[in-house]
């Protein structure tokens, strides 16, 4: 029997957007945008864990408090180095496959995420994405890779 690899969705989020400050906390149909997105991500059937990677600074405390209040797993890391934040979040939870989602892609589709995870596993690939050659509308960006 094949070993089951730990698959984690890591959502990159922050409050201090330049074009639309506090976008992730903006309300859509009465609920913060980030909670709507997380509700969709939770529906992925092939993920073992969902973690939100946010900068460790006081500018993101409101976001952190909202996520903790709603019982989400949060990793707070390097403010400037997003790659380091991702790496440390993945290392903390011992992920073997990472699904990279950004909070500015609020329409992430859990079925599409599961499809990409399946492709990565079945074809024994290291990387699957719909961003190298845009094949889906903006807001549906997904990257899946081994770690």
Describe the residue ranges of each PLM region.
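Short glycine- and hydrophobic/aromatic-rich loop-to-beta-strand nucleating segment
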Residues: 140-147
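Short aromatic/hydrophobic "clamp" motif used to bind/position activated sugar donors
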Residues: 98-99
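N-terminal nucleotide-binding beta1-loop-alpha1 segment
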Residues: 1-21
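A conserved acidic beta->alpha catalytic loop
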Residues: 55-60
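Short, high-confidence coil segments that cap the C-terminus of an alpha-helix
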Residues: 47, 94-95, 122-126
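Conserved donor nucleotide-binding strand/loop of the catalytic core
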Residues: 68-80, 91
């Amino acid at each position: 029997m094949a070993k089951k690899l730990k698959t984690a969705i890591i959502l990159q989020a922050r409050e201090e957007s330049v074009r639309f400050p506090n976008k992730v906390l903006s309300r859509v149909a009465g609920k913060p945008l980030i909670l709507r997105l997380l509700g969709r991500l939770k529906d992925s059937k092939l993920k073992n864990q969902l973690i939100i990677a946010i900068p460790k600074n006081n500018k993101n405390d409101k976001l952190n408090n909202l996520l903790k209040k709603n019982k989400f797993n949060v990793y707070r890391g390097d403010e400037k180095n997003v790659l380091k934040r991702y790496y440390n979040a993945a290392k903390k939870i011992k992920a073997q496959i990472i699904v990279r989602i950004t909070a500015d892609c609020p329409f992430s589709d859990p079925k599409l995420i599961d499809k990409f995870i399946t492709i990565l596993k079945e074809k024994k690939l290291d990387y699957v994405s719909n961003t190298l050659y845009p094949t889906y509308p903006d807001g549906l960006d997904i990257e899946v890779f081994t770690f």
